[in-house]
Amino acid sequence: MKEFFFMAGMQRSGATILSAILNQNPDVWASPASPLFRMMTTQIQSHNELENIDYNRSEAIDNVIKNIPHIFYADKKAKYIIDKNLNWPNPVGAELIFKYITRNIKFICPVRNVLDVITSFDTVINSTDSKNNIMDEQVLKNTFADKPLADRRADFLMRHDKDIALSLEFMKHSTLPQFRHLFHFVDYDDFISDPEREINKIYDFLEIPKFNHKYENIVDTSGISRESLTGIKDLHTIRPTIQKVSRRPEDVLLPETIKRYSGLEFWRELR
């Protein structure tokens, strides 16, 4: 029987390379962004269907939902599955896990300075292959043309209904004492400076046997596409070596944008 863990966290925070390293261990499979959460929430609606109200099969429906993770990962031989979706730490996700998957809830959360995340997005979008992309179309349509494009992108990315703000909101459940033990944060800068230490901390958190990982010539075996639905290429492409290649936010964003999105790294107060 497979054991399930969960990865949430922020975009552009090293989740892809972190997963690539963990996947060197044949007993571990860390997925790219996965549809498992949506699949399970969709099936929960079956409880409210008219057919189930007339002929109650709620217990059978629950059994089907419980089996979805095992069927979904039936092609993986790994003992330990780390399913990635930013929604897992929200109340619906946590309840799904507790009721249908495991009582041993553990969230791995790659995180990064918010301004560095914004700057990293800007860097990737400005690459030659990504000049024309869906996200910029939305940025131009939904932000005011009173500031440079980089700052308009920042405002768009930080909207309450976009992934950065959502992931921050969901992870803030870790600030509640009764939920703190469910979360393990992997800060991008800590990971870059000492990846072996951070990987070992993950094993300690998951309470599974350690593995002798390699930190050079890293290969992503997940099969995730280089293309993105946003039109931004190489969002998930990793380098073979672990290094920080990034511009400074001060070189990209206006001072008022930097001020607006500074100091949001609440997890640093939890250590």
Predicted segments, located by residue:
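PAPS-dependent sulfotransferase catalytic core
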Residues: 1-75, 221-226, 232-235
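PAPS-dependent sulfotransferases, especially Golgi type II membrane carbohydrate sulfotransferases
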Residues: 1-5, 147, 153-158, 172-177, ...
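Residue-level preference for the first positions of well-ordered beta-strands
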Residues: 4-6, 79-82, 183
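Hydrophobic residues in well-ordered beta-strands that form the structural core
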Residues: 30-32, 82, 109
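C-terminal/domain-terminus segments
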Residues: 41-42, 191, 266-271
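CE4/NodB-like, metal-dependent polysaccharide N-deacetylase domain
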Residues: 65-77, 167-178
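Glycine-rich phosphate-binding loop used to anchor ATP phosphates in small-molecule kinases
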Residues: 69-94
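PAPS-dependent sulfotransferase catalytic domain
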Residues: 86-213, 229-235
